[in-house]
């Protein structure tokens, strides 16, 4: 099965769907919103081509479920709020928003929500139906999506940790795994494995910046939020807990060791310094803002029961990783993986060691020399 076919969230609206298990991401989006407003404010000051008539925006790696339109709402509200602050504003610009993700993404679940979303925009923002136009642009964000110099603003949240492919060199010529017992570039991975993952991330992120800089107008903006490495040596991110759960099944005899050793996630969690260095090395963008912050896995969860919290965290992670796990290990073992995941989560949550480190970076496309 092709990798792109399983790089998606759980679709639909069932108990294990991303739509039902993505409340955590709403907390991240709330943290990003003030930075988004400032980014839009700077964008509207830049006087880009046609921006007073139609602002063209894309959400790269939009996923599905209510969070997709929550992101859209935040973008629209930010544009309208900043627009109201401008003097002599005569008319709101039309906003054209493209939702991007891989072809298997459950776009239909998003489209079903659009009629009520448009009505809500009209009621709460006074935006007439037709003044905000939302469509899909499926495809990999590591490839060209839009014409040259056609976009004003690109947004992406929690997507850049996904690589375009599993790094090469993780299996020797004799077919032996160089990342035994691990499923990504973890703290336990050998240095050659860590280098292979960093090299793949560097290649992919450089491609991402180059391609999308070509799609943006000069002075266009890009706002990226991603998971990043922290400095805490004993903290456990969700993939660490997932790795521990799968290893449990091997030790218990429910899963062959070879099955674990032949599995590597196409995921890399960069440090803030790595992201900064790649942006500077690629050269198309100026860094306007960079911040890191933590969000606990169970933040915003009101029930004070560690086991219920752990099940909640397990469901959130399952909604993200089930498709790719099921394609390799089979669907039957998925409940067992996340049952053990919840047990590990229940141990780290009371200690405050279960959280994501996050990075927000705001970028502006540098002008061409002829524009200066």
Swiss-Prot record:
Its cofactor is Mg(2+). The keyword Acetylation does not apply. Binds 1 Mg(2+) ion per subunit. It comes from the Eukaryota. The keyword RNA-binding does not apply. Pathway: Alkaloid biosynthesis. The record marks 155, 267, 331 as: Involved in substrate discrimination. It is an enzyme of class 2 (transferase). Mg(2+) binds at residues 179, 261, 263-264. Pfam families: Methyltransf_7 (PF03492). One of its GO terms (biological process) is methylation. S-adenosyl-L-homocysteine binds at residues 18, 62, 67, 101-102, 140-141, 157, 159. Signal peptide: none annotated. It catalyses: xanthosine + S-adenosyl-L-methionine = 7-methylxanthosine + S-adenosyl-L-homocysteine. Its EC number is 2.1.1.158. One of its GO terms (molecular function) is metal ion binding. Expressed in stems, young leaves, floral buds, developing endosperm and immature fruits (grains). Detected in roots and old leaves, but not in mature fruits. Xanthosine binds at residues 21, 25, 158, 161-162, 316, 321, 356. Saccharomyces cerevisiae (Yeast) expressing Coffea arabica (coffee) xanthosine methyltransferase (CaXMT1) and Camellia sinensis (tea) caffeine synthase (TCS1) accumulates caffeine. Tobacco plants (Nicotiana tabacum cv. Xanthi) expressing CaXMT1, CaMXMT1 and CaDXMT1 accumulate caffeine and become less appetant and toxic for caterpillars cutworms (Spodoptera litura). Caffeine also stimulates endogenous defense mechanisms against other pathogens (e.g. tobacco mosaic virus and Pseudomonas syringae) by triggering the expression of defense-related genes. This is 7-methylxanthosine synthase 1. It comes from Coffea arabica (Arabian coffee). The gene is XMT1.
């Amino acid at each position: 099965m092709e990798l792109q076919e399983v790089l998606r969230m759980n679709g639909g609206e069932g108990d294990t769907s991303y739509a039902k298990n993505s409340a955590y991401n709403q907390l991240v989006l709330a943290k990003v919103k003030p930075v988004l407003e400032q980014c839009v404010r700077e964008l509207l000051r830049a006087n880009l081509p046609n921006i007073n008539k139609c602002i063209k925006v894309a959400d790269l790696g939009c996923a599905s479920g209510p969070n997709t339109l929550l992101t859209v709402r935040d973008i629209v509200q930010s544009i309208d709020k900043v627009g109201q602050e401008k003097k002599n504003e005569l008319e709101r610009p039309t906003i054209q928003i493209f939702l991007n993700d891989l072809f298997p993404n459950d776009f239909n679940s998003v489209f079903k929500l659009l009629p009520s979303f448009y009505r809500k925009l009209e009621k709460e923002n006074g935006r007439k139906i037709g003044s905000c136009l939302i469509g899909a642009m499926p495809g990999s964000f590591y490839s060209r999506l839009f014409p040259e110099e056609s976009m004003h603003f690109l947004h992406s949240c929690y997507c850049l940790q996904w690589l375009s492919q599993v790094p090469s060199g993780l299996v020797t010529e004799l077919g032996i795994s160089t990342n035994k017992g691990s499923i990504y570039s973890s703290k336990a991975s050998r240095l050659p494995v860590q280098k292979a993952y960093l090299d793949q991330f560097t290649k992919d992120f450089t491609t991402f910046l180059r391609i999308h800089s070509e799609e943006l107008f000069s002075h266009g903006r890009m706002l990226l939020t991603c998971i990043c490495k922290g400095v805490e040596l004993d903290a456990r991110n969700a993939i660490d807990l997932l790795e521990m759960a799968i290893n449990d099944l091997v030790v218990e005899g429910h899963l062959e060791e070879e099955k674990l050793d032949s599995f590597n996630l196409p995921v890399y969690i960069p440090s803030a310094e790595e992201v900064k260095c790649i942006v500077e090395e690629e050269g198309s963008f100026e860094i306007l803002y960079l911040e890191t912050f933590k969000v606990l896995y169970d933040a915003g969860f009101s029930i004070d029961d560690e086991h219920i919290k752990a099940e909640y965290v397990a469901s959130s992670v399952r909604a993200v990783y089930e498709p790719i796990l099921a394609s390799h290990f089979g669907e039957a073992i998925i409940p067992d993986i996340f049952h053990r995941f919840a047990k590990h989560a229940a141990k780290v949550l009371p200690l405050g060691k279960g959280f994501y480190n996050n990075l927000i970076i705001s970028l502006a496309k540098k002008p061409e020399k002829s524009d200066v």
